[in-house]
Amino acid sequence: MDALDGNAIAGQLFEVFGVDLTTASGTCAGCGAVAPIAELSVYRSAGVVARCRSCDAVVMVLLSRGGSTRVDLRGMASLEVAEPNGATS
């Protein structure tokens, strides 16, 4: 099975979170690598599995069924999302 990049799940993530997460930085819980979601290796089957490009650990699983989507992020130690339009708190 050929891997896609994280841009392949941009639409699904936007539907769930309401923001573009492709530029968000995720930290792999396995190896500590930090990379944009767009750089994950994505595999589609019954659901979607996203893996760290550095260590191949599963960092995200997306399962859609019955009108809902489950997002499992247990392989991601953290996710940093920039505030929209450069807003500051």
Whereabouts are the PLM-identified features?
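A broadly conserved sequence feature marking short terminus-proximal activation segments
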Residues: 1-24
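Basic nucleic-acid-binding interfaces
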Residues: 11-12, 68, 87-89
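Short cysteine-rich clusters marking metal-coordination/redox-active sites
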Residues: 28-31, 52-55
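Short, non-ligating residues that shape and space the ligands of small metal-coordination modules
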Residues: 37-38, 61
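Surface loops and adjacent helix of pleckstrin homology
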Residues: 40, 53, 64-65, 74, ...
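Short linker/helix segments within small regulatory modules
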Residues: 40-49
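Short metal-binding segments enriched for Cys and/or His
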Residues: 56-70, 81-82
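Short, charged, intrinsically disordered terminal tails
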Residues: 73-89
